[in-house]
Structure formats: C-alpha cells, structure tokens
C-alpha cells in the first residue's frame, strides 16, 4: 500500500494515516 502523510490520506487509500 502507499504510505502517505496528508489530510486526505485515508480517503486516497493510503496507509498508515499520519494524523
């Protein structure tokens, strides 16, 4: 899975969410 750290991380299917 992608690893993202932005406000919409969960909505874009990224994991983990950093907030």
UniProtKB/Swiss-Prot annotation:
Expressed in which tissues: Expressed by the venom duct.
Any one annotated GO CC term: extracellular region
Cysteines paired by S-S bonds: 4-18, 5-14, 10-17
Modified residues (4-hydroxyproline): 16
Domain of life assignment: Eukaryota
MF-aspect GO terms: toxin activity
Principal subcellular localisation of the protein: secreted
Localisation per UniProt entry: Secreted
Keyword Methyltransferase applies: no
This protein's UniProt keywords: Disulfide bond, Hydroxylation, Neurotoxin, Secreted, Toxin
Function field: Intracranial injection into mice causes scratching and hyperactivity.
Family: Belongs to the conotoxin M superfamily.
Domains as described in the record: The cysteine framework is III (CC-C-C-CC).
Protein name: Conotoxin mr3b
Organism: Conus marmoreus
Lineage: Eukaryota, Metazoa, Spiralia, Lophotrochozoa, Mollusca
